[in-house]
Curated annotation (Swiss-Prot):
Native organism taxonomy: Bacteria, Pseudomonadati, Pseudomonadota, Gammaproteobacteria, Enterobacterales
Name of the coding gene: modC
Any one GO CC term of the record: plasma membrane
Enzyme class: translocase
Full protein name: Molybdenum import ATP-binding protein ModC
Source organism (scientific name): Salmonella typhi
Transmembrane segments: none
Any coiled-coil regions, as ranges: none
PROSITE patterns the record matches: ABC_TRANSPORTER_1 (PS00211), ABC_TRANSPORTER_2 (PS50893), MODC (PS51241), MOP (PS51866)
Occurrences of domain ABC transporter (ranges): 1-229
Domain Mop, residue spans: 289-352
Length: 352
């Protein structure tokens, strides 16, 4: 668990934190350039020194301004992966990995190398590696120091799209298989969508939202960040049943369910789905004899005008679902907050 309660001057703004981050999973730190993302993880790692407050990791005080405590970076047991891999060019991959390796990690070397898929790279020099391969080695080196926390500062920012796609599955595997919390700095919505368990949104050094990805993604804070074509809902669901006659799987959403193409997932397993706002239409009465398999009872929470369209925020079993309709449809159906209606979901995609 990481306790952040500090403030630090950030240009014309002040970075102010009073949050507790979880002891596992990936927490994404999101915001535009200058929002305070890198300043936050630099303060956590000990590269900078906040003028007020405390930083505590798993009960260990890393920084306490009032009592004059400020552990040096090497004493904090924190791994840091930068945008550029920063490997030693004269060491082979094996040497880079073993540099600074904790004795306690000796028995984990082969497992971690396999997890990152870098077995074939061990005897190569960094100059012969692709950008994605270098970053995998950098992540491995950071993990072999036996950190209690891993910081990743936009590790995919310098990579082209094919290399990003190459690295994402390895990061997903790490999140599932290692019991180390990770802070992942990014301004990429796609990376956050595929990796994050929780999201912290920073703006001018202030926390605008912090919580599970599903909640933050569907909040009004995140809504302006999403391009019109990406306006969507992220929902955490569980596998309810597999259809006895058709290749379809039912996913539980509160006391309702969604049908999707058959999944090779055991019953009760959890996963994350994405529904585009443009794939949701609204009706006042449950339709009869429709080809759309997913019709959900929902309550209108809010309506927002957006460049000639209307974004409708719906509540379904405590979750948020977005729909995009025309002003004509809104006016004709008299859609307003508090109205109960039915949402027809035309398409569902699985994200994680």
């Amino acid at each position: 668990m990481l306790e952040l309660n500090f403030s630090q001057t950030l240009g014309t703004h002040c970075l102010t934190l009073n949050e507790t981050l979880p002891a596992s999973g990936i927490t994404a730190i999101f915001g535009v350039s200058g929002a305070g993302k890198t300043s936050l993880i630099n303060a956590i790692s000990g590269l900078t020194r906040p003028r007020k407050g405390r930083i505590v990791l798993n009960g260990r005080v890393l920084h306490d301004a009032e009592n004059g405590i400020c552990l040096t970076p090497e004493k904090r047991r924190i791994g840091y992966v930068f945008q550029d891999a920063r490997l030693f060019p004269h060491y082979k991959v094996r040497g880079n990995l073993r540099y600074g390796m904790a004795k306690s990690m000796t028995g984990q070397f082969d497992k971690l190398v396999s997890l990152l898929g870098i077995e074939a790279l061990l005897d190569r020099l960094p100059g012969s590696l692709s950008g994605g391969e270098k970053q995998r080695v950098a992540i491995g080196r950071a993990l072999l120091t036996a950190p209690e926390l891993l910081l990743l500062d936009e590790p995919l920012a310098s990579l082209d799209i094919p290399r990003k796609r190459e690295l994402l599955p390895y990061l997903q595997r790490l999140a599932r298989e290692i019991n180390i919390p990770m802070l992942y700095v990014s301004h990429s919505l796609d990376e956050i969508l595929h990796l994050a368990d929780k999201v912290m949104v920073l703006e001018d050094g202030q926390v605008k939202a912090f919580g599970p990805l599903e909640e933050v993604w569907g909040s009004s804070v995140m809504h302006p960040w999403l391009p019109k074509e990406q306006q969507s809902s992220i929902l955490k669901v569980s596998v309810l049943e597999h259809h006895p006659h058709y290749a379809m799987t039912a996913l539980a959403l509160g006391d309702q369910h969604l049908w999707v193409n058959k999944l090779n997932q055991p019953l009760q397993s959890t996963l994350r789905i994405r529904i585009q706002a443009s794939d949701v239409s609204l009706v006042l009465q449950p339709p009869q004899q429709t080809s759309i398999r997913n019709v959900l009872r929902a309550k209108v929470a809010n309506c927002y005008d957006d460049n000639g369209q209307v974004e409708v925020q719906l509540e379904i079993g405590g979750r948020t679902l977005w729909a995009r309709i025309s002003p004509w449809a809104r006016d004709e159906l008299n859609i307003k907050p508090g109205l109960w209606l039915y949402a027809q979901v035309k398409s569902v995609s699985i994200t994680a």
